[in-house]
Structure formats: C-alpha cells, structure tokens
Amino acid sequence: LNNMNFPGQVVVTSDGKVLVADSDNNRVLVWTSFPTSSGQAADYAIPTTNYVNFGDSWPWGVWSDGTKVIVTATVAKAVLFWNSFPGPNDAPDVVLTSSQVGTPRSITSDGNYVMLGDENANGPCIGQNGTRSTHVWTSWPTSSRDPDACIDNWLASAIHDSKIYGIAAGGETMYFYDNLYT
C-alpha cells in the first residue's frame, strides 16, 4: 500500500486523513492519520474498479471533508459518492453516470455543492473551450442524475465562504465567483 502508480488528486481532511487517487492502480489510498515518514504504507485502499461496470476505473480526482467522500472513475465515466467515510469494502452510496460526463477529473465541493472538472464533456457545456468543462450539482447527489449547470472550462478550484476560486486547465485563466455558480 505504498507503491503508487500515476497518482492524481490528493486531499487532507481537517481531522488528518489523507486520500490519494492512485490512478494506474485503480484505487484510492487512505491514511487514517497524517503519515509520519516518507514512503509510509497507507492504512487501506478503496478498490474503485469494484464499483463500476468497466474494466478499469482510473480514479483521478478525490475529495473529502472527513465524512463524505467523492472519487472520479475517469475511464468508466462515473463518479462515486459516499455519505459517510468508507472503509476498504464499503460500496459507494451513489454511482453517478451521466451522458454529459466524459472523463471526469478534478473535484471541488463544500459537502453539498459539487463541481466536477471534465476534459471530455458532452452536452450543453461544449463551447469555446471544446469539450473541457466543469459540471455543477447544486446539492449533494442522492441518485445518478445529470448536472444542474455547467461552466465552459475545466476548472481546478476551491470553495471558501460560498465563493469559488478556480484555475482553468492549462493555468491560463483564473475564475472568481462571488456566489456558488448555478
């Protein structure tokens, strides 16, 4: 549990848990407390391929507030949602698929509002940036459904005090929203 292969997004929760999307190993590594040494093995892994109808899952994005967890299954065109922090064998509460989601990558959330950066989106958000877009769910999904809105660019972002701070893929543009985008 210490050999990563093409790690994607990482998140450190306020209570010290560390989650790493270990893309080429089709899993999310979980340390239940912050590692104290380099190369320290994870406490366990969440095997994301178990929860999608595709050969690989290739998790790229991961988000958590210490309770809820979101993981992208990029190759499977799916997003996995847990309402409570999962153990190694806990299935997600929601496996979200949508014809609008292509290859989901980055995740931003405040525990209710969810933004999903997508390099190969389909549907209404295809525009000046080609297929790069960010899907928006204005409330935590409780079932598989299409996004509520979209932003015509793939953003890596953060939410603070109900404001969005984002950088477009490639780093050429910054986005600031004084309110959550709907």
Report the location of each language-model feature.
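Short loop/turn segments immediately following the C-termini of beta-strands
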Residues: 23-24, 33, 74-75, 84, ...
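Structural signal for beta-propeller blades
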Residues: 26-28, 77-79, 122-125, 134, ...
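Surface-exposed loop and turn segments in beta-propeller and other repeat-based domains
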Residues: 1-2, 40-54, 93-100, 144-160
